[in-house]
Amino acid sequence: MEYKILDCTLRDGGYYTNWNFNSKLVRQLIKSLDNNNVDIIELGYKSPVIGGPYRKCNDGFISSVINFKVKADLAFMIDVKDYITNNKVNKSLIKDIIKPSSVFKICRVAAKYNEIQ
């Protein structure tokens, strides 16, 4: 069995900082995680909800902050409740934010059972 280590310090920490982080701190954290062989670094959300830049995880912004090669896969999270239209998950909205050319390789999805039935 293969194990992967995922770090969600920034995504989870955003609840305390409204997803605003100092770019130098982010670069130092990512370099440290990468040097310690963390497999996946979850940077924040891709969300239409108001919040700092790590609540949006815009590819251009992330690329400007992380201007160096990272071995780990970069990830973001979406919350299904942000993509519900007429009481149904709007899959086209989700597909629009997941681009093959993205700096992100992984999208994690947070959902409650009743949101995805």
Residue ranges and their predicted role:
Residues G13, L33, C107:
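Conserved, mostly hydrophobic/aromatic
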